[in-house]
Swiss-Prot record:
Induction pattern: Repressed by the negative regulatory complex REP1-REP2.
Chain's role: Plays a role in 2-micron plasmid partitioning. Antagonizes transcriptional repression of recombinase FLP by REP1-REP2. Regulates both stability and copy number of the plasmid by blocking the formation of the REP1-REP2 repressor complex.
Name used for this protein in its record: Trans-acting factor D
Keyword tags: Plasmid, Plasmid partition
GO terms (BP aspect): plasmid maintenance; plasmid partitioning
Organism: Saccharomyces cerevisiae (strain ATCC 204508 / S288c)
Upper lineage: Eukaryota, Fungi, Dikarya, Ascomycota, Saccharomycotina
Outcome of swapping residue 162 to D: In strain: ATCC 7754
GO CC term, one of those recorded: nucleus
Amino acid sequence: MPYKTAIDCIEELATQCFLSKLTDDDVSTFRRVCSKENDIIKLALRIPRTIDYTSILRLLYDTLPLRSLSFNEALPLFCYSIDPAQQRQCDLRFYLRDVVKLARPRKRLEMQKALLQWLPSLLSDVTLQLLNDIRIRFEEIQPNIRQTVLQIYDRTCYPSLNFEHPNLGVFPETDSIFEPV
């Protein structure tokens, strides 16, 4: 399927969210299409976290006009805004990525199957509510996964999440990143 815009390409990548790494062809197409997109924040916010998110960030950095910044200086542009709800959204994406990566093989397959029901939503605007719903479902599939993640990664990897709280300190019903309609 031909890619007409950067968003088309990103949406194709989104269908692989958490499921697989990018193929060489995907990377090549992504590089080519994204080189035409100038709005880096808009582009970055439309890319769900993937297993190999850092590689995608590096591709973005290589292809978009950020030459005046080092990769490490540019990285926060992709990850955080001053809005606390968007920070939690970002950290939840990283947490979900790590949950899938660290799940036991059978549980990982179950998580990947469960994720299929959310793919249509992941292709559009991802809300904090949706990400929290996915988190709850994944933690039901492998109840000890939170402890597993924290054994491998320090809680400071997800600075806006509160691991002392059952809901990680995320309340989607009041913590919306979108203005009420």
